[in-house]
């Protein structure tokens, strides 16, 4: 990408939900399609020494999505009223505020920490368990953070790009955060395994349904879905770690490390 929108890149609201992570990061490129130019020959050094392994893993993840998650998402989208879908998305996004708050604190961002705690408290109570995003209407902005961003803020480079089975796009630096975020999500604390699995499944399908309208645009940006999603992921992570304050040299430096 040669240019970025000032308000950043799309973030996965159903964070780390298996193959959905790949898809949401890919949609970062879709979000940029109205305000940026995609180039597969950009100046960015896309640190991908493990591509011979990454591509087959990506292909399996994508095939799994096309065979299972996409059809489920289409059915969900067709039979579920939009207000209910919004409520489901808000509910799961609210659960991620715990992860956001902890990492805002570790990054030395007291105001962002207070905002995340405030959002969690307000939406969990006035927002009926997070179904209604009351906090945003009160000016408390959602600021997604994770351990990978925290490690990056502390100065660690991204390391090589890696595609994990079902977990999708990652870097060596982001893998610990991907795993930790799962355990910081209250869904992981549920003792009833059947109910927990149902909730995780609903989260994944709801997250996937949010991409249906954008998916066709991806094929118009590039015929190489792997490269498209990789580029989107690497730039999105660099953008998030810098809180949007970076230029092309900063981006190249972070990705190349």
What is each of the regions a protein language model found here?
Residues 12-24:
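Bacterial N-terminal signal peptides that target proteins for export
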Residues 88-91:
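Beta-rich strand-turn-strand
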Residues 42-68:
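Post-signal peptide N-terminal segment of mature Sec-exported envelope proteins
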Residues 37, 41-42, 154-257:
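A structured, mid-to-C-terminal "fold-capping" secondary-structure block
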Residues 94-169:
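Mid-length scaffold segments of soluble, non-membrane domains
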């Amino acid at each position: 990408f040669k240019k970025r929108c000032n308000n950043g890149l799309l973030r996965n609201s159903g964070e780390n939900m298996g193959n959905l992570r790949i898809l949401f990061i890919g949609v970062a490129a879709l979000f940029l399609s109205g305000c940026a130019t995609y180039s597969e020959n950009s100046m960015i050094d896309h640190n991908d020494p493990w591509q011979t392994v990454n591509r087959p893993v990506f292909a399996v993840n994508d095939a799994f999505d096309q065979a299972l998650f996409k059809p489920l998402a289409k059915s969900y989208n067709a039979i579920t009223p939009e207000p209910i879908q919004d409520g489901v998305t808000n509910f799961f996004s609210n659960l991620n505020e715990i992860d956001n708050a902890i990492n805002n604190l570790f990054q030395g961002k007291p105001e962002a920490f207070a905002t995340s705690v405030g959002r969690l408290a307000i939406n969990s109570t006035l927002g009926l368990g997070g179904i209604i995003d009351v906090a945003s209407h009160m000016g408390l902005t959602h600021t997604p953070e994770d351990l990978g961003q925290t490690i990056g803020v502390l100065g660690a480079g991204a390391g090589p790009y890696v595609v994990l089975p079902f977990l999708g796009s990652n870097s060596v630096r982001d893998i610990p955060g991907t795993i930790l975020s799962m355990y910081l999500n209250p869904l992981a604390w549920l003792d009833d395994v059947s109910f927990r699995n149902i909730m995780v499944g609903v989260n994944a399908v709801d997250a996937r349904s949010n991409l249906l309208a954008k998916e066709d645009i991806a094929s118009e940006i590039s015929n190489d879905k792997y490269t498209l999603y990789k580029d989107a992921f690497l730039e999105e992570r660099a953008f998030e770690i810098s809180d949007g304050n970076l230029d092309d040299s900063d981006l190249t430096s972070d990705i190349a490390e």
